[in-house]
Curated annotation (Swiss-Prot):
Entry note: cofactor: Binds 1 zinc ion per subunit.
Function (record text): Catalyzes the isomerization of 5-dehydro-4-deoxy-D-glucuronate to 3-deoxy-D-glycero-2,5-hexodiulosonate.
Residue positions binding Zn(2+): 198, 200, 205, 247
Domain of life of the native organism: Bacteria
Assigned EC number: 5.3.1.17
Protein name: 4-deoxy-L-threo-5-hexosulose-uronate ketol-isomerase 1
InterPro entries from the UniProt entry: KduI (IPR007045), KduI/IolB_isomerase (IPR021120), KduI_N (IPR027449), RmlC-like_jellyroll (IPR014710), RmlC_Cupin_sf (IPR011051)
Organism: Rhizobium meliloti (strain 1021) (Ensifer meliloti)
Keyword flag Nucleotide-binding: no
The organism's taxonomic lineage, starting at the top: Bacteria, Pseudomonadati, Pseudomonadota, Alphaproteobacteria, Hyphomicrobiales
Pathway membership: Glycan metabolism; pectin degradation; 2-dehydro-3-deoxy-D-gluconate from pectin: step 4/5
Cofactor list: Zn(2+)
Gene name per UniProt: kduI1
Protein family according to the UniProt entry: Belongs to the KduI family.
Length: 280
């Protein structure tokens, strides 16, 4: 099969503050995630999160052994969450098939076995976004629809940040070891995400931006509050966020994003808010 794995080392705040644009992208941005007929994985040393894009074309794709994990099988010591942001497709866990429509998710517990991916229509392929973190126990596999997700409305039109957070892998929806995963949608005219900003030193986070027109761009802000930087992202690009960094963005047009966290706790509200006067 066609699978690639890249490794990202940890970048500290002092190093990040000295980097130019390409240096920031090399350290934090994940490009070309979704390529037809390929499974592209990025192994980040931030809480050992694996971020992947799987696009089955005519042939089924399988993730079973990833040498970088040091285990016989990918899920021997890991859990995973998979969200489909493309056409309808099927994810196989061991010998059981799960059909995922657009914006439907599958949580797979530790020891679930090989993961198989197939598209219903190769001309409108599924786009499977894969997130995986180390696990210490097995939790049940759960198929999660958007209706099942816990809804949280935040922001306002006046602040240009009215949005709905759909919590997919969350203690109130789906048992997991440490993964937290959700999808944020915006009201028309709202462009800002995660502003006012915050940090959570106890957890890393990764954003995947999607649902964008070809010319739309996200100006994603990162860095320590007093040393902010930005990267410009297009559709289907992801960005890693260490615990010390803010993670906020504004779009030139409509967009959505998937967020995922791993770390010390599973409290979505455990964050250190950053006052506006602290941002530079």
């Amino acid at each position: 099969m066609t699978i690639s794995v890249s490794v990202r080392q940890v970048v500290g705040p002092e190093d990040a503050a000295r980097r130019n644009t390409q240096g920031l992208r090399d350290g934090f941005v994940i490009e070309a995630l979704f390529q037809p007929g390929r499974a592209n994985l990025t192994y980040s040393h931030l809480d050992r999160m694996i971020v992947g894009g799987v696009v089955p074309a005519a042939d089924r794709l399988v993730i079973d052994r990833v040498a970088e994990t040091g285990t016989q099988r990918f899920l021997d010591r890991r859990e995973a969450a998979i969200i489909n942001i493309g056409g309808s497709g099927t994810v196989s866990v061991g010998d059981k098939d799960h059909v995922l429509g657009f914006q439907e998710a599958l949580y797979v517990g530790m020891g679930g076995g090989a993961l198989g991916f197939a598209s219903d229509d190769a001309n409108a392929p599924a786009l499977f976004y894969v997130l995986s973190a180390p696990a210490h126990r097995s939790c049940p596999t759960v198929h999660i629809t958007r209706d099942m997700a816990k809804k949280l409305s935040l922001g306002s039109a006046e602040e240009s940040n009215a949005r709905t957070i759909n919590q997919y892998v969350h203690p109130d929806v789906c048992e997991s070891c440490q993964l937290l995963v959700g999808l944020t949608m915006f009201e028309p005219g709202s462009v800002w995400n995660t502003m006012p900003a915050h940090v959570h030193d106890r957890r890393m986070e990764v954003y995947l931006y999607f649902g964008m027109q070809e010319a739309t761009r996200i100006f994603h802000f990162m860095g320590e509050p007093g040393e902010t930087r930005h990267v410009v992202l297009k559709n289907h690009e992801a960005v890693l966020s260490p615990g010390w960094s803010i993670h906020s963005g504004a779009g030139t047009g409509r967009y959505a994003f998937i967020w995922a966290m791993a770390g010390d706790n599973m409290s979505f509200t455990d964050m250190d808010k950053v006052p506006m006067e602290a941002l530079r």
